[in-house]
Amino acid sequence: MNLHEYQAKALFAEYGLPVSEGYACDTPQEAVEAAGRIGGNMWVVKCQVHAGGRGKAGGVKVTGDKEEIRAFAEKWLGKNLVTYQTDENGQPVAKILVESCTDIANELYLGAVVDRATRRVVFMASTEGGVEIEKVAEETPELIHKAIIDPIAGPQPFQARDLGFKLGLNPTQMKQFTKIFMGLAQMFLDHDFALLEINPLVITTEGNLHCLDGKIGVDGNALFRQPKIKDMHDPSQDDAREAHAAKFELNYVALDGNVGCMVNGAGLAMGTMDIVNLHGGKPANFLDVGGGATKERVSEAFKIILSDSNVKAVLVNIFGGIVRCDMIAEGIIGAVKEVGVKVPVVVRLEGTNAELGAKVLAESGLDIIAAKSLTDAAQQVVKAAEGK
């Protein structure tokens, strides 16, 4: 689960980190009034969406005119912002963040992730702030400095000082950086974050460190013990199909291919996508129906898959372990009849009562292609998607 910038900065402020005075606004009038409360003669207005690249897409504006703030809010509120990180439809803008303007002397990067290789929280800092860190990692990886947080000892001030020296900070900035580092590390651990970024972490013209942006990703599996964070969820930013799938405990991720995939088990689902790709097809989705492939869940899975107009064929790959294949076959037949599937459906069943399941499918009278193996299933569905 991701948080908006204004939500991230509210958390930063709770931990005593330096952030700009700002207000998240729902209407153009609120945005103008927010500028008045902030004071000064220059403000920054930002569209609040779960995507980067807002500035290049016109979603960020620096202005000294309150009427321009009103016009910006009128332009974007209720509209979709398309950036390089969104799909072609973009993300809906429901709030505008109005902030005081900060004079910048230099831009740095500070972030943290859960690193699966080291099984630790790893902090990263760089002098290359204000640009995509992925680009820095690819082109100049030596400019990214790391600190690994020991899960027993926790974050240590010496780690902050080590990063600060590598960033070329002066003694005053070093103290500020240490406070920011320790606060962020504690916040990361307290709230079960999976990702945290301040890009850029700026040095102002007065020589002080300031958190100019904030990006936070939370471990969705930990939300049961993070009620405060869970309440920050903005469903408008979710993919509509993924949100619908979650209601039925289906794990769905939309992709850009034309072969719909319905599988039970995440590992088998990834293997299915790989073999479809191996035989020249492009998966349209990842969809794990879980252990209980009931008629209702299979029906909803078909509806979700077929809501993607790019899908030209569907591959159902089920391993019957706890659930018998004949029961799964009956569920598939019922779902196909209920949904009215118009594209070719290839089914591969393996495991308990697999032969009986294949017989049930064959006697259904429906246009369902029963595959003999996973390779056969992949080849059949790729041909079907191509209209062969």
Swiss-Prot record:
Pfam families recorded: ATP-grasp_2 (PF08442), Ligase_CoA (PF00549)
Family per record: Belongs to the succinate/malate CoA ligase beta subunit family.
The keyword Lyase appears for this protein: no
Pathway annotation from the record: Carbohydrate metabolism; tricarboxylic acid cycle; succinate from succinyl-CoA (ligase route): step 1/1
Database matches in InterPro entries: ATP-grasp, ATP-grasp_succ-CoA_synth-type, ATP_grasp_subdomain_1, Succ-CoA_synthase_bsu_CS, SUCC_ACL_C, Succ_CoA_ligase-like_bsu, Succinyl-CoA_synth-like
ATP-grasp domain residues: 9-244
Residues at which Mg(2+) binds: N199, D213
Record EC number: 6.2.1.5
Coiled coil regions in record: none
Source species of the chain: Shewanella amazonensis (strain ATCC BAA-1098 / SB2B)
Designated name of the protein: Succinate--CoA ligase [ADP-forming] subunit beta
Record-linked NCBIfam families: PRK00696.1, sucCoAbeta
Catalytic function, reaction form: succinate + ATP + CoA = succinyl-CoA + ADP + phosphate; GTP + succinate + CoA = succinyl-CoA + GDP + phosphate
Known cofactor(s): Mg(2+)
Gene Ontology MF terms: ATP binding; magnesium ion binding; succinate-CoA ligase (ADP-forming) activity; succinate-CoA ligase (GDP-forming) activity
Gene, per the UniProt record: sucC
Cofactor, how bound (note): Binds 1 Mg(2+) ion per subunit.
Record's GO cellular component terms: cytosol; succinate-CoA ligase complex
PANTHER family in alphabetical order: SUCCINATE--COA LIGASE [GDP-FORMING] SUBUNIT BETA, MITOCHONDRIAL (PTHR11815:SF10), SUCCINYL-COA SYNTHETASE BETA CHAIN (PTHR11815)
Subunit structure, interactors included: Heterotetramer of two alpha and two beta subunits.
GO terms (BP aspect): succinyl-CoA metabolic process; tricarboxylic acid cycle
Keyword annotations: ATP-binding, Ligase, Magnesium, Metal-binding, Nucleotide-binding, Tricarboxylic acid cycle
